[in-house]
């Protein structure tokens, strides 16, 4: 398969959370173009079945292939847990997820071998973070906690709100009691609540946000495949954004967290794919 190295990277998530990954790609791979898709009509993914998540992921990848992307980042932990293996087998394009990079950092950082994971019901229920961590270091004890209200709170824009603080305190108490020294933010929405989580967990707990590590993993993949952009193609709009619903709301949120002025977000009918 002949892939154009100046083609964009496809990035997708259930909503706005994957923007934390897109942001790190922008910062660390500035020559790369991005096509981002947020499945805002069907968020959250965390409560959906594995079969449904695989179907959604296939639809989105078909759409991204239509945009002629050269590689795809599944910037969603639930889709990475449930769909990554299936779509890698099915599509002839390099695809990475966000779970392995985070697990590798957590295994390297923990001192007391007690690692916490927070994520959606689907991600936590899959046990995939624990599986990766145990492969890396069998002596690690893993404590997982589903935090299903975090995604709706982020999508609502309640990043600094007393309600969010109260919800976070209730969710995280269990992990505080387990004395974890490292906490994986196992959903790409959760870094947007980092300051709240930090306040509750304290300064001594290492918070692992896989977005940065995922950008580095993407960089390694592109180099390995000979697909890194040489930055010779100038483009007035290097970053394009698509959603399945609520385009204006998405655009406003994206502009609040990205180091780039998002001028247009286009709504598409993802069910066609």
What is the role of each PLM region?
Residues 1-273:
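Non-catalytic structural scaffold of enzyme domains
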């Amino acid at each position: 398969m002949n892939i154009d190295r100046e083609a964009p990277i496809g990035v997708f998530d259930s909503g706005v959370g994957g923007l934390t990954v897109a942001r790190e790609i922008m910062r660390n791979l500035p020559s790369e173009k991005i096509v981002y898709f947020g499945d805002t009509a069907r968020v959250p993914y965390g409560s959906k079945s594995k079969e449904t998540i695989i179907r959604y992921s296939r639809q989105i990848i078909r759409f991204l292939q239509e945009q002629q992307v050269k590689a795809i980042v599944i910037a969603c932990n639930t889709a990475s847990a449930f769909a990554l293996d299936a779509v890698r087998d099915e599509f002839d394009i390099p695809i990475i997820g966000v779970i392995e990079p985070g697990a590798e950092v957590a295994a390297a950082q923990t001192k007391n071998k007690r690692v916490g994971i927070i994520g959606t019901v689907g991600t936590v229920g899959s046990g995939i973070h624990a599986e990766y961590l145990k492969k890396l270091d069998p002596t690690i004890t893993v404590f997982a906690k589903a935090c299903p209200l975090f995604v709706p709170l982020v999508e609502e824009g309640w990043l600094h709100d007393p309600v969010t603080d109260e919800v976070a305190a209730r969710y995280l108490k269990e992990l505080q009691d387990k004395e974890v020294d490292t906490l994986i933010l196992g959903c790409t929405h959760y870094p947007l609540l980092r300051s709240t989580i930090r306040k509750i967990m304290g300064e001594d707990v290492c918070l692992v946000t896989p977005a940065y590590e995922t950008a580095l993993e993407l960089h390694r993949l592109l180099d390995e495949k000979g697909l890194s952009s040489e930055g010779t193609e100038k483009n007035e709009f290097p970053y394009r954004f698509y959603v399945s619903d609520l385009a204006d709301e998405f655009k406003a949120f994206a502009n609040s967290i990205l180091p780039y002025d998002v001028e247009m977000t286009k709504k598409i009918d993802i069910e066609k794919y």
